[in-house]
Amino acid sequence: MENILDLWNKALQKIETKLSKPSFETWMKSTKAHSLQGDTLTITAPNEFARDWLESRYLHLIADTIYELTGEELSIKFIIPQNQDEVEAMPKSPIKKMSKEDPVDIPQNMLNPKYTFDTFVIGSGNRFAHAASLAVAEAPAKAYNPLFIYGGVGLGKTHLMHAIGHYVIDHNPSAKVVYLSSEKFTNEFINSIRDNKAVDFRNRYRNVDVLLIDDIQFLAGKEQTQEEFFHTFNTLHEESKQIVISSDRPPKEIPTLEDRLRSRFEWGLITDITPPDLETRIAILRKKAKAEGLDIPNEVMLYIANQIDSNIRELEGALIRVVAYSSLINKDINADLAAEALKDIIPSSKPRVITIKDIQRIVGQQFNIRLEDFKAKKRTKSVAYPRQIAMYLSREMTDSSLPKIGEEFGGRDHTTVIHAHEKISKLMVEDEQLQQHVKEIKEQLK
């Protein structure tokens, strides 16, 4: 038999033609041939999650592909190289296909055609959520049910939910897939009660193969809607139908959510999405530019990625804003133009660090005393009072320690600084003129 590495590379090339691009890149691309002993081929998987999925879904595909290449029937074993946690791959029973009875037409605008696995940019903050979503899409109700995805606004939760819906329909056109927000679920439920159409409402959402419900946190506090969703959840789960839920927080942190619903959300897999790192943000911008047919210099994408670090929607929106601005003023896109285009949504610079000397300078101007007076031993009220105000502000507006503040005021003891802070704090409660002085000084410092 040929070299094991060459054999596995050929096998991967064949397998790639038999799988969708997202499936191949998520599950197969990171595998490696480990060893061939007797009639057992050992393959490494990057982690336990991938290993379990490979053995449950791709065992026969791999074995058949190896047979096509070699004419030999080999047993397949998967291991995790980090800890050599070997698991003998066992044949699994065929996965039952979803019901094709009573097909329901899915509204064309229900799933965004741009939100697919192919257009999703994978990074460290969403890799697990992406893999779990793909697993659910490939085997609805067999992998994780429910799948609960949570994370901040604009990080890709809705994208993954739509991608699951597209994948299921692409591979089973008669599948009944419904996507909606919890707000829409609530409104339709209320309308069904008002119009005496509760039965129709229940039939619509309890006779689907995949239910994708977004922003479940909005059910908090809505007791009747929670009751209805509880029974909808139970019906679908008992009939082995897939449920995918998204939220801006994990189930345990959703206020006024009934315990019985919370516990059901925790039956399956809970995965989060975190803000993308710099490399992922740049990759997102590149993919967006390519999709829109835009030629954007690398320096511009790096600039935008450095300025917007938490929200993918804002990131993509910033790119479009730069392109639009370039078109309006008829100038080439570069980093300077990007900075000009985004000046209203990106601070021109980080807030400046306020120093004790800055405070002394502004207080001195307000009370007409010299900088050296702050360090002098003078105890006249005309000097001591502004000095105490400056000490108060140094404590409030800088990160300097008490000894450091005392040092900047002529080597005074830290207890003097504490006394000054307490005195000015008390005086400000009673003295409106002092309040105004301090307010003006703070404004000038900022």
Swiss-Prot record:
<dbReference type="Pfam" id="PF08299">
    <property type="entry name" value="Bac_DnaA_C"/>
</dbReference>
<feature type="region of interest" description="Domain I, interacts with DnaA modulators">
    <location>
        <begin position="1"/>
        <end position="72"/>
    </location>
</feature>
<comment type="subunit">
    <text>Oligomerizes as a right-handed, spiral filament on DNA at oriC.</text>
</comment>
<dbReference type="InterPro" id="IPR001957">
    <property type="entry name" value="Chromosome_initiator_DnaA"/>
</dbReference>
<dbReference type="GO" id="GO:0003688">
    <property type="term" value="F:DNA replication origin binding"/>
</dbReference>
<keyword id="KW-0963">Cytoplasm</keyword>
<comment type="function">
    <text>Plays an essential role in the initiation and regulation of chromosomal replication. ATP-DnaA binds to the origin of replication (oriC) to initiate formation of the DNA replication initiation complex once per cell cycle. Binds the DnaA box (a 9 base pair repeat at the origin) and separates the double-stranded (ds)DNA. Forms a right-handed helical filament on oriC DNA; dsDNA binds to the exterior of the filament while single-stranded (ss)DNA is stabiized in the filament's interior.</text>
</comment>
<dbReference type="InterPro" id="IPR038454">
    <property type="entry name" value="DnaA_N_sf"/>
</dbReference>
<protein>
    <recommendedName>
        <fullName>Chromosomal replication initiator protein DnaA</fullName>
    </recommendedName>
</protein>
<keyword id="KW-0238">DNA-binding</keyword>
<dbReference type="InterPro" id="IPR013159">
    <property type="entry name" value="DnaA_C"/>
</dbReference>
<keyword id="KW-0547">Nucleotide-binding</keyword>
<dbReference type="GO" id="GO:0006270">
    <property type="term" value="P:DNA replication initiation"/>
</dbReference>
<dbReference type="Pfam" id="PF11638">
    <property type="entry name" value="DnaA_N"/>
</dbReference>
<feature type="binding site">
    <location>
        <position position="156"/>
    </location>
    <ligand>
        <name>ATP</name>
    </ligand>
</feature>
<keyword id="KW-0235">DNA replication</keyword>
<dbReference type="GO" id="GO:0016887">
    <property type="term" value="F:ATP hydrolysis activity"/>
</dbReference>
<dbReference type="InterPro" id="IPR003593">
    <property type="entry name" value="AAA+_ATPase"/>
</dbReference>
<keyword id="KW-0446">Lipid-binding</keyword>
<feature type="binding site">
    <location>
        <position position="154"/>
    </location>
    <ligand>
        <name>ATP</name>
    </ligand>
</feature>
<feature type="region of interest" description="Domain III, AAA+ region">
    <location>
        <begin position="110"/>
        <end position="326"/>
    </location>
</feature>
<feature type="binding site">
    <location>
        <position position="158"/>
    </location>
    <ligand>
        <name>ATP</name>
    </ligand>
</feature>
<dbReference type="GO" id="GO:0005737">
    <property type="term" value="C:cytoplasm"/>
</dbReference>
<dbReference type="InterPro" id="IPR018312">
    <property type="entry name" value="Chromosome_initiator_DnaA_CS"/>
</dbReference>
<dbReference type="InterPro" id="IPR027417">
    <property type="entry name" value="P-loop_NTPase"/>
</dbReference>
<dbReference type="GO" id="GO:0006275">
    <property type="term" value="P:regulation of DNA replication"/>
</dbReference>
<dbReference type="GO" id="GO:0008289">
    <property type="term" value="F:lipid binding"/>
</dbReference>
<feature type="region of interest" description="Domain II">
    <location>
        <begin position="72"/>
        <end position="109"/>
    </location>
</feature>
<dbReference type="Pfam" id="PF00308">
    <property type="entry name" value="Bac_DnaA"/>
</dbReference>
<dbReference type="GO" id="GO:0005886">
    <property type="term" value="C:plasma membrane"/>
</dbReference>
<keyword id="KW-0067">ATP-binding</keyword>
<dbReference type="InterPro" id="IPR013317">
    <property type="entry name" value="DnaA_dom"/>
</dbReference>
<dbReference type="InterPro" id="IPR024633">
    <property type="entry name" value="DnaA_N_dom"/>
</dbReference>
<dbReference type="GO" id="GO:0005524">
    <property type="term" value="F:ATP binding"/>
</dbReference>
<dbReference type="InterPro" id="IPR010921">
    <property type="entry name" value="Trp_repressor/repl_initiator"/>
</dbReference>
<feature type="binding site">
    <location>
        <position position="157"/>
    </location>
    <ligand>
        <name>ATP</name>
    </ligand>
</feature>
<comment type="similarity">
    <text>Belongs to the DnaA family.</text>
</comment>
<dbReference type="InterPro" id="IPR020591">
    <property type="entry name" value="Chromosome_initiator_DnaA-like"/>
</dbReference>
<feature type="region of interest" description="Domain IV, binds dsDNA">
    <location>
        <begin position="327"/>
        <end position="446"/>
    </location>
</feature>
